[in-house]
């Protein structure tokens, strides 16, 4: 598992990617609208009045083609007493659902980043306490390294003892055969 700083960097990269994907989705899927209450010809609202990209023009043409079909279906639904409530178009509901899901993903990722930041050392710890902790860890590491060197020496001694015992057994076997 990666250390906390690497995890934090990965989460930040993922958050940036999610922001980018969300903005791209809104940019390509949302209906153009005025940004503020200024005049329609103001600079801030010119984007809403700009010609539509080809993909959005195709979508609007498809909608217009589907409208006559929906008008045929609506009288049938109006005769049904259960369908008295007016529901928003399916595309609007779908767009809103996707936006809610994307927002939830962004919120969860930002909470994950906050938890990683909170788990980082140094917050609420003075530099002296950090140095003391580093010194303690360094002392523990030196003790473990000395123990490791001692165990290596012990292993080498045991190997030498085993080798000498094997030589004695081999010599004993050869002497009995001669």
Swiss-Prot record:
GO terms for molecular function: transcription coregulator activity. It comes from the Eukaryota. Keywords: Activator, Coiled coil, Nucleus, Transcription, Transcription regulation. InterPro entries: Med7/Med21-like (IPR037212), Mediator_Med21 (IPR021384). Pfam families: Med21. GO terms for cellular component: mediator complex. Residues 67-85 have a biased composition (Low complexity). Residues 36-91 are annotated as: Disordered. The keyword Transport does not apply. Residues 128-169 form a coiled coil. It is found in: Nucleus. Component of the Mediator complex, a coactivator involved in the regulated transcription of nearly all RNA polymerase II-dependent genes. Mediator functions as a bridge to convey information from gene-specific regulatory proteins to the basal RNA polymerase II transcription machinery. Mediator is recruited to promoters by direct interactions with regulatory proteins and serves as a scaffold for the assembly of a functional preinitiation complex with RNA polymerase II and the general transcription factors. Belongs to the Mediator complex subunit 21 family. Component of the Mediator complex. This is Mediator of RNA polymerase II transcription subunit 21. It comes from Candida albicans (strain SC5314 / ATCC MYA-2876).
